[in-house]
Regions:
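Charge-rich, low-complexity N-terminal segments
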Residues: 2-6, 12-60
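Soluble non-cytosolic domains of exported or imported proteins
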Residues: 23-27, 90-93, 131-138
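Short, highly charged C-terminal tails/helix-capping segments
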Residues: 156-161
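A mature extracytoplasmic/lumenal domain signature
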Residues: 44-46, 54, 67-69, 84, ...
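A short, solvent-exposed beta-edge/loop patch
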Residues: 105-152
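Long, continuous compositionally biased terminal/linker segments
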Residues: 55-83
Length: 161
């Protein structure tokens, strides 16, 4: 029984967990976004919120770069994400299945369904090393914005995000 408890504790310790952080912005996020030349605002959680304009058909897309990081052993990553669907109603099953099928075709990132209070969201997320350089961060920002916008257009026909 002691071995089972010890194994359970070790397994729990190995699961990815958020790094301890307060609600201030991460200096690494600030530095890399400024180095790239992006303008952004910092939300209440300390995350960087960007509006990516100039997408197809004059569209734009919101995306966030998390200030908090995830730790798995020695590996530290952060999420870059965008919402393509936000509604009081859950995403219909056939559209959720479509997102799951799309996941297999992406080089980076995946779709997940989340609930924020009473609202349901389809969120595209890419995890990058927390200390990723500007070239990598810029590539991921563009991938997140373009993917989020294309799927928002496909799911809703709108440009709300």
């Amino acid at each position: 029984m002691k071995k089972v408890c010890l194994v359970s504790l070790l397994a729990a310790a190995c699961i990815s967990s958020p790094a301890m952080a307060d609600s201030t912005k991460d200096a690494r996020v600030d530095a890399v976004l400024k180095d790239i030349g992006y303008k952004y605002e910092v939300d209440a959680d300390g995350d960087a919120k960007l509006t990516m304009g100039g997408l197809s058909d004059g569209r734009s897309q919101l995306l966030w770069v998390n200030a908090n990081t995830n730790i798995l052993g020695e590996y530290e990553s952060r999420d870059l994400w965008s919402i393509a669907y936000l509604s009081e109603q859950p995403l219909p099953d056939e559209k959720a299945k479509m997102l799951l099928e799309k996941n297999a075709s992406y080089k980076v990132g995946s779709w997940s369904l989340k609930k924020y209070g009473s609202r349901y969201a389809a969120v595209f997320t890419v995890q990058v090393p927390a200390n990723a350089d500007k070239k990598a961060v810029n590539a991921v920002i563009m991938a997140v914005a373009l993917t989020g916008d294309a799927v928002e257009k496909e799911l809703t026909g709108k440009d709300d995000m």
